[in-house]
Amino acid sequence: MEILNENYNEWRIYYLEKEFLSLGKKLTDESEIDVVEVYKESQRNYVAKIKFNNKYYVLKSPRNEYRIPQRRFATLFKEGEALTTLKNITELRNRGLVELVAPLLVVVRRTKGMIKESYIVFEFVEGEDGRNHILEMIQAGEKMHSLGTYHGDFNPSNFIWTKNGMKIIDTQGKKAWTPLKQRYDLITLDYDNIDDFDRYAKHKKDFWFHLALLLKKYKRNSIIEKIKKWKKKKRDQGWRI
């Protein structure tokens, strides 16, 4: 499916179907959007369930991308998280990874070449998280890996079991240049989320596994975790770090 785009005032709208162009224009004025439920609202991100033309969708804004100076500066040279996600996931779905929840629309506003604000709209899916469907969750993740990509936050809350099977959410669908991130996906599921991983799958204990395991242990180091929490707290207080 081809991604179309159009300028609208200060915004650039990217969409898959013409019907979403009008939604994109409405997103430039948040007061016109029918917000059904806000799932998350912080200085870091915004996630909400919205209604448009009698259908439900999920609206997200990666605020961290444009509130942290170094990340905002980097958008001079990048397409941004929202547009990258739209392109990556659309390509992966075209290649058969229909388990990925479909992104439908992106709106981006830039000033001086840097992203000032952006939103992405996904289809809405209902179901339960993957905790009771570990095997199907692992199979969906391994299908991602087979296409040369990785999830990046491989935990049950990002896999939704629906009446149509497993759906994958909250990923940018980035390319895995080496197996490191793919090994890290499964280590995250095993070490952080479930107690009986070996019932469902086996780790491929190669060089990349051991490197990913070392990285996981580094990130779980108490000192590193304290530094991350301190930085998050200060950013939420308005510090530009």
Question: Residue locations for each model-derived region?
Answer:
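Juxta-kinase regulatory segment immediately upstream of eukaryotic protein kinase catalytic domains
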Residues: 1-37, 225-240
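ATP-binding glycine-rich loop module of kinase domains
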Residues: 34-37, 43-83
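Short hydrophobic-acidic sequence motifs that mark active-site Asp/Glu residues
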Residues: 49, 56-60, 121, 168, ...
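Conserved structural core of kinase catalytic domains
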Residues: 78-83, 90-93, 100-135
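Protein kinase catalytic-loop region centered on the HRD/HxD motif
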Residues: 143-149
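Catalytic-loop of the protein kinase fold
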Residues: 149-156
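C-lobe/activation-segment region of protein kinase-like
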Residues: 150, 165-241
